[in-house]
Amino acid sequence: MDLKQELATKGYAIVPNVISTEQVEIAKKLFREWQATIPDHDNVHAKVDPHGIYKYHHAGHTKHAWYLRTLPAVQAVYKKLWDCDKLITSFDGCCYIPKSLTKKDNCWTHTDQAPSSKGVKCYQGFIALTANKERTLVVYEGSHTLHERYFADRGNTSNKNWCKIDPAFLDTIKDTKRALDVPAGSLVLWESRTFHQNHYGKPNSEERMIQYICMLPDNHPKNTESMKRKRVKYFNDRRTTSHWPCPINVNGEQPQTYGDKSRLIDYSKVVKYDFPDVQMQEAIMKLL
């Protein structure tokens, strides 16, 4: 089964060996170096990054993120999917779950495509820097084909691109639930209608380290001149975004405080990476 057919049938796919063992180690080293720049990282990460997902601290513009986005082998998968020669990227964050974590899972299974949006619009993805089968992505196989009916039955016509799925409904399709066994170096893809969530798995089981990567064709109808200017601005400002390259939407720079000001991030202490290497600069600019 080819990749497009697998995505059309199952709603997800694991593409193994997209990056080499050496490239995995380079990215992991850069990832850990970035983590070390965040004061009191472990406590801060546990407190402000939901489900282990980095949304703050310029997480969309780390060295490891741009290293992986600009690798030809990663781009080649997206170019083949979209049958194009030129791509644009989101500035999505990354995810880290330490082996020592003992939190239990709750249900926040969701779809990232609005109820009002029909058909294939986007393929989300991540590069796995660790091998995982416990702390991993959970998907409901074939759920992308249920997206339209699910929301129609509930009279939901929202244009919001994040919608939680009713746990009672998920129980009716529990036989399609898959906790993915993901080798390091893989690119995991899923169609944005697919019902999915992160999964902690067993306590003290595995370290999980991934970089989210999502790309669309440069000639996408929503990639207007205004949108291109906005993406360049968000790059220059080092803003982290949702997974959609267009229309591009930034995350807030501060987490919810819930009255606790210690959760606020002091951006004067956050490293804002520059990319002085000319080849890297050129590779980045091609994706904006």
Segments from the language model and where they lie:
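Non-heme Fe(II)/2-oxoglutarate
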Residues: 37, 189, 194-288
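Short, conserved beta-strand element in jelly-roll/cupin
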Residues: 116-133, 181-184, 189, 214-217
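Short edge-strand/loop segments of extracellular domains
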Residues: 99, 142-147, 214-220
